[in-house]
A protein has these predicted regions:
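Structured, active/binding-site neighborhoods that engage oxygen-rich ligands
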Residues: 1-167
């Protein structure tokens, strides 16, 4: 299991058991301190603190762990708020929060609406301002050796991969 698995379970636990996102994340991450690949540097630092505070971080950790919000809430505005709350306990940069909100919202839309991939792409652009790259642009990551873990880059890449998928 990876850090994202542990953190996703922690978010689900917080929602289902009415815990704070912070308490649940700390509990689960401290209980499982050595996931495959480790925690990001920023999240590791946050976990290790006695009284962790959010950092001005826009890493994709928050987008990777937010899926339970999209599955367990049924109101669009509540999903935006809960995604924000789940992110800002450790990452309070607006770009990180927006990445979490976007991923949770996409899950909600796909779960509750009859929406085509074209409509989804348009809605993401309209609601979150993301420009979705082409698959050719994504292939360049490997050939050019460029990659970063920021929400503003990785969330649109993930959306593009979904839009290009057949299932």
């Amino acid at each position: 299991y990876t850090d994202d698995t542990i953190c996703s379970v922690a978010i689900a636990d917080a929602i289902l058991n009415k815990r704070t996102y912070k308490d649940s994340l700390l509990d689960w991450c401290r209980r499982y301190p050595n996931p495959m690949g480790g925690y990001s540097t920023a999240l590791s630092t946050w976990i290790e603190q006695d009284n962790p505070q959010p950092s001005n971080n826009c890493g994709n950790d928050v987008a990777m762990r937010v899926s339970p919000v999209g599955w367990l809430f049924d109101d669009y505005h509540e999903i935006l708020e809960e995604a924000k709350k789940s992110a800002e306990v450790s990452h309070n940069h607006p770009n990180g929060i927006m990445g979490a909100q976007c991923v949770a919202t996409i899950i909600y839309w796909l779960r509750t609406c009859r929406i085509t991939k074209e409509e989804l792409e348009s809605a993401v652009k309209r609601n979150f301002g993301y420009s979705i790259p082409t698959i050719k642009d994504i292939y360049k990551i490997g050939s050019e050796g460029h990659f970063d873990g920021l929400c503003e880059e990785t969330v649109p890449y993930a959306i593009s991969c979904f839009l290009e998928s057949d299932n």
